[in-house]
A protein has these predicted regions:
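Cytosolic regulatory regions of ion transport systems
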Residues: 1-451
Length: 451
């Protein structure tokens, strides 16, 4: 596919990196020549210097032949104008980054009037992911599929866990049809496990099942499942605002610490149920006097990765049971892993996976639709949700009759609203949702899983 990206900041670069990795024909537009020089040296892309909302820059980028234009500059208005111009000039599909909550609430109108095909909001996406993790505090990652019927959770195994020290065949024999372990990381090795895999203490693993089953399994291993009732947020960013809306709606007490007084006043006006504290979030005297660490979860979402990491570690030292820092620089992830923090949020990585899911769906509009896509274990594994259609080649056949590609699992099937952990007798029918977990095979169609 020919894809144009307007705006090469953190989000734009992450999307460009993902799209070039999936072998798309990519053009990037930005006003900053230094940024373009860097992108040109790192990625296989064509660069156009200019205003992405101008017809001249869009035409130079080949907008008339573009299958998709993605506008992700720092300015919402520029992104919207860019998509409007691109559609008028012939782009088949357009995606705009919209961060302002007021615009984001008007998404249906924008789609209809401007012809937008998709609106992305990294801050809202990050807030939604944090809220899912807080619902299962003993997990470091929680992803959902099939409108919430299926849950993929990541956690670190501990000594004494029922999963540890026995093969998955033996575990599944003792716990039939409950969950499926579908990915693991041991040291630097990433594994899509088969039945002979034996989990060890300290493995980072992912299991899939219904929300009720994944919760039951974690509880049976003694994991803390008490609800999160008090949350402290460092930084009055848009992520903080979106997250506060979600949490206060379910009765969670939220405190936000922000050092910019004007921003505090705005937050206090928009979030009447939230306690907003004006002050430096790195000032320990302030944090102690205000009881910021007397909470069930501490979320650090300032604009500085270093501050987020430092204060997350401080919160952990104070005994906060769930700590989540936001990281923009993926290079920091190795450092984070060494600190013992198990959960990190990266808005740009979340958006890159959303865009990848959308692009794969466009590229295969006649086949089995890609409904959602999540990258796990640092992007080494992808979990893809498909809808089986009449174009699927192996409908109504037992899975034991099929030969699948290496490094791949059919992890779950949803039929008529019921989730099944598949076995050799299971069959896929038209209309079923199928979740596939694989090492990065860039699956675009359900038929791609066959060897």
């Amino acid at each position: 596919m020919k894809i144009i990206i307007v705006g090469i900041g953190k989000v734009g670069y992450a999307i460009a990196e993902q799209m070039t990795g999936e072998n798309h024909d990519l053009v990037v537009i930005d006003r900053n020549s230094a940024v373009l020089d860097h992108v040109d040296s790192m990625l296989d892309v064509m660069c156009v210097e200019g205003n992405g909302a101008s017809a001249s820059a869009l035409l130079e980028a080949g907008v008339r032949e573009a299958d998709l234009l993605i506008a992700v500059s720092e300015n919402d208005e520029v992104n919207l104008i860019c998509c409007l111009m691109a559609k008028k000039l012939g782009a088949k599909h357009t995606v705009a980054r919209v961060r302002n909550p007021e615009y984001f609430r008007d998404a249906p109108i924008l789609r209809r009037e401007i012809g937008l095909d998709m609106i992305i909001n990294p801050e809202n996406a990050a807030a939604q992911e944090i809220s899912r993790i807080l619902r299962v505090p003993s997990a470091f990652s929680v992803e959902t599929f099939a409108s919430g019927l299926v849950e993929l959770i990541g956690f670190q195994t501990e000594e004494g866990d029922s999963l540890v020290g026995k093969s998955l065949i033996d575990y599944n024999r003792e716990n039939p049809n409950s969950i499926l372990m579908c990915a693991a990381k041991r040291g630097e090795e990433v594994i899509v496990p088969n039945g002979s895999f034996v989990p060890q203490t300290g493995d980072r693993v992912y299991v899939i099942g219904t929300p009720a089953e994944t919760t039951r399994v974690l509880r049976s291993m003694g994991r803390a499942m008490a609800p999160i009732r008090r949350v402290s947020i460092l930084g009055g960013s848009r992520i903080a605002q979106y997250l506060a809306w979600v949490l206060t709606d379910v009765g969670t007490h939220v405190t936000i610490v922000e050092k910019d007084e004007a921003k505090c006043l705005t937050l206090a006006e928009k979030l009447p149920k939230v306690t907003v504290i004006h002050g430096d979030g790195t000032n320990h005297d302030l944090l102690e006097s205000e009881g910021i660490f007397h909470c069930d979860a501490f979320i650090a979402v300032t604009d500085r990765d270093e501050e987020n990491l430092l204060m997350a570690l401080t919160a952990k030292r104070y005994g906060v049971k769930k700590v989540v820092p936001k990281m923009s620089r993926m290079g920091y992830l190795d450092i984070v892993n060494l600190t013992g923090l198990d959960t990190v949020i990266s808005p740009k990585a979340i958006i890159a996976s959303q865009i990848s899911s959308y692009v794969r769906g466009l590229a295969n509009s006649q086949g089995s639709a890609v409904e959602s896509l999540h990258y796990i274990l640092g992007g080494a594994i992808e979990a893809v949700e498909f809808t089986a259609t009449s174009a699927t080649h192996f409908l109504d056949r037992p899975l034991s009759d099929l030969h699948f590609r290496n490094g791949l699992l059919v992890a779950a099937i949803v039929h008529n609203g019921r989730m099944e952990i598949p076995n050799g007798h299971s069959q896929i029918h038209a209309g079923d949702r199928v979740i596939v977990v694989a090492k990065k095979l860039f699956l675009q169609d359900l038929n791609d899983i066959l060897g």
